[in-house]
Amino acid sequence: MVEVELKFQIPEARRNALLKALDPKKSKIIQLKAKYYDTEQRLLSQHGVALRQRLEGTRWIQTLKAAGKSHLHRFEHNYDLGELEQAPQLDLSIYEHDAEAQQILKNALQNSQEPLKLQFETDIQRTFRVIQFQETDIEVSLDVGEVRTGTAQREMHEVEFELKSGSVQSLLAFSFEWVKKYQLWLDVRSKAEIGNLLAMTQKVSPAKSAKEFTLSKKDPANKNLRLLIAQQLQHLLPNIAAISAVVSEKEHIQQAQIALDHLNLTLSLFKDWNESVSDKWAMQIGAFKQQFDHLQHLEHMQTTLGAFLQNPNTASNLTKDILYAKEKLANLVRSTQNVHHYLELLMFSLDTEEQAQSHDLKWFAQNTLQNQYKQLQDSLTSAEITDFE
């Protein structure tokens, strides 16, 4: 089955208010104790796969999870192992009759003979209830607890919105209502990813790089644009999560900047490919990207002018300015306004209701190319040598 959910982090000052909104009297509370398994080389996590056994109340459930087509979608296979006095042994034979689960494990493990060993555990108290919104059932789960290894632990306090029935569009609209009320910020990192980092004594996963996109000849222009933006969000959001959590490295900031540049170009060049594209999106993304450019300019001055001048006051001021720019950027990427932008683009990229177009993809591609060439030629023609003096 495919699980559709969004996860958000909650500012400490808004946690009690969110718990009240969930209303514990109307909610269920369950203790979830999970054990996560992988090989010594982390072959499963390298392929975006998680394998766990979790005690849910009195029953043990073995779950296989894998990345899906977007940050909302995940493959999930659950198997009820029953009520047991002790934690059960890991059992891979339960996947023998599920072709998709078998393929996921085969792709990750290949021919490895490495045994699957316990890597980390989670101990979570979940307060949850199903809320109806626009004829859609959404399970809201507040998870509070910790992830731990034999030598380290980390607190967890997050909220998940899972689609139980209805439309993805309603799930996204519902999520944004909670984002506005409780200043939630989108976090595409899973508990498995956080646990693996803790087990490896690392703060953050490597920065996500862009993947090459190929237009699909069999699909219309409006669908191709949705697919392109979906892929660019796959590039952007993991890097944004690292910045939001204040654990990012230089590469995360650079890759987020590249992803925003790609999104800005896509929304500017191909806006006529889909009637649902808003003119404001490119402007919003462009303004957002300027904050990354500002940090880049400061860092460039530090490594060039600052290094050359060797002035202690200049060096100190540049260091302070860069630190301030990074703090401002971390606040900006998790701001309600920008989380709204992410959700708006996600909503657009996942919409499946395409309007019939009177022209095929080739016509749109040729038309866009001709228009861009004309703009470039007009710009070159109007340029005078004095413009560069």
Predicted regions: what is each one?
Residues 1-389:
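Function-determining surface determinants
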